[in-house]
Amino acid sequence: MKNYTLLNISIGLDVSKESISVYIPINNLDYEIKNTLDGFNKLISKLKKLYKKEYDNLVFVYEPTGSYSELLKKFCSKKSIKTFALNPKRSHNFAKASGSRNKSDMDDAKVLSGAIVLAKSEEISIPVISAVAEDIKELMSYYKFIVKQRVMASNHLESITVKDGNNYVISSLEDEIKTLKKRENDIVVNIKKIIDSDEDLSAGYENIKSIVGIGELGAIVLLHLFLKYPDANKKQIISLVGLDPTRFDSGSSVHKKSKISKAGAKIYRGVLFMGAMMATRYNPEMKLFFDRLKANGKQTTQAQIAVMRKMITIAHSLYKKKQKYSSDVYQKACGML
């Protein structure tokens, strides 16, 4: 029997909407499958023939690509296949360091296979899928879709109304906006029912909501974020919301003011911005933090964004540590205790 190394059992998978490029190191084999259950089953059959008794030791390495990689994750969970879900930034840096020019998807799959060397032991595991958490994710995805539709309809209504446009169009848009708002509320009610039906989710939700300034929707949005990215650290969570600073430097003389990246979904920032405004009025610690930033010369928006970051990192800590908010918790989070 062959003595397989970690690199030999690392299967690289470059995921796209309709297909997945696969690199199988044992025979330096490039392989393409459909991004379907049938495609995965064909791959498994091939891998079992190639690896025989070593099949159970295989590790699938891939970059999470939103909804496109969800089926792969669920399949691996069901079939007890170990995976290493590689952060795209780490993957890019590894490819650059290894001299890859990313000429094709097959090259990308090979790079992903080699990236197994980056994995810590705790990062290689069989995915755990929570049916309840998946329901919340799907409902939140639908909620974001409905909100986007409502915003588009509202903007269109404004453009028609300002020029005293067609009454039928105005009336239809007003009805559509009312319907979409009702649907948003219905989705929130459904999500809350799911949360209330699960003891752990309910506790996590209440711990997040214990921060003065974070309301029902804010707690749902953050709970969804923490469920979606269970292994993210505080810095990564801030980036996923799109509140990480982006600096602009050109040469030695041009330095623009840093801005937030806005890389995450707008709904997170929109909901949490309202929460930050409430917190600066009714949360003593957040108000003090905000006032101190203002006194030090920060603009109002900059100070509000800083409050948002602070609220998110504290909420993340409360969720992870299963604690409720208090002045002591805030001071510990700020290194004051």
Put a short name on every predicted segment.
Residues 2-25, 112:
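Gly/Thr-rich phosphate-binding beta-strand-loop-beta motif of the actin/hexokinase/Hsp70
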Residues 27-59:
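Nucleic-acid-processing active sites and adjacent nucleic-acid-binding tracks
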Residues 84-207:
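Long, charge-rich intrinsically disordered scaffolds of nucleic-acid metabolism proteins
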Residues 124-138, 161, 165, 256-259, ...:
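Short, solvent-exposed helix-loop connector elements
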Residues 210, 216, 222-296, 300, ...:
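Phosphate-backbone recognition surface of nucleic-acid-processing proteins
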